[in-house]
């Protein structure tokens, strides 16, 4: 659990966006709604919805997680079916569910470790049963 309320992020983001940065990236997972401070989530979500240059991290989870039909994820998840995409493809994604999906601009922060378990490279995109999911850095290339 992240210790700061979303009001901290919202309070940081408002003046930062006033400076017109090309992009702001949160490499933090906003996957759980704050049940104690829902107004903080709402404020943060409103700022994200109004800004087209704020990007959030997401993660493909391992096989132990309960998989969901990829086609059922919101469009904001950024999954793109390729020519070999299976209609019944499933995967488990940790998405920023604390934020309305209409405000999502996200990318995967997964990496594939080397045989010794150390991550020395970064996945440009994830291939999930014929579906492509862009990494967070790749998502930023288009700005």
Model-derived regions: residue spans:
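Non-transmembrane functional regions of envelope-associated proteins
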Residues: 1-141
């Amino acid at each position: 659990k992240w210790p700061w309320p979303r009001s901290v992020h919202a309070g940081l983001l408002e003046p930062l966006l006033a400076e017109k940065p090309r992009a702001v990236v949160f490499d933090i997972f906003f996957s759980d709604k704050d049940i104690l401070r829902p107004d903080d989530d709402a404020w943060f979500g409103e700022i994200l919805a109004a800004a087209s240059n704020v990007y959030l991290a997401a993660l493909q989870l391992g096989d132990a997680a309960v998989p969901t039909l990829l086609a059922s994820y919101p469009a904001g998840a950024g999954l793109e079916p390729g020519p070999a995409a299976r209609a019944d493809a499933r995967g488990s994604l940790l998405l920023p569910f604390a934020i309305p999906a209409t405000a999502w601009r996200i990318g995967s922060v997964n990496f594939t470790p080397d045989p010794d378990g150390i991550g020395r490279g970064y996945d440009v995109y994830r291939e999930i049963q014929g579906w492509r999911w862009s990494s967070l850095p790749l998502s930023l290339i288009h700005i």
